[in-house]
């Protein structure tokens, strides 16, 4: 789906440019060739990469993004060019992209995509995935309380859309001692479903149609299944990112003192020696 006509989407992606760069800075140096897969157009991030001396190359299926890259003289690949690339990149970076591949691509399309990336990476290269994820959480139900009646209907609209699109199962809504639903709602479910609700809602209803079709609760099992096992990679480093700039936006909708779950999880993958 074309995200780049949406002003809110582009602004949100550009605001996270610093976090996006921090993840890969240690891998960049003069002569390093980076493929930013599913790049979008983030001028500040591109500038930061180029200032390290690394060679930045973008890849995005969006014609709008390709036009922006072309107008700004940024190197990018078409799909035909990427399909033919072999042992070309030192670093392949998927930032907020893996969950979209899981959400929108068929199984054959996923296999084709990851085979293409494996072929394009140098034997000693690294794949870095930065994406949504709730981390390793207990399976017991927890609560997520809506801030006020003013936003209660908006949150419930998201919940209903996520249920309809099979992103979550129906959460419990807390009742009082007389079996009346408490308003504003207090949702109860296992953490990964509440994670989906919390980070979807913060986009606002203008993004409902697009974002409600995407699953955010990724974990290492997805990466192991689709990349590590088929192509002999190992997750050599994994850590969580807590971006506190999300908190005031989340507090508009939910009673939170701090971020209960990570905003992103980072995975570094290296090819196993044969």
What role is predicted for each listed range?
Residues 101-116:
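A short, conserved alpha-helix within the catalytic core of class I
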Residues 37-82:
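Class I SAM-dependent methyltransferase SAM/SAH-binding core
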Residues 213-231:
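Short alpha-helix
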Residues 93:
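A conserved beta-strand element that flanks and buttresses the S-adenosyl-L-methionine
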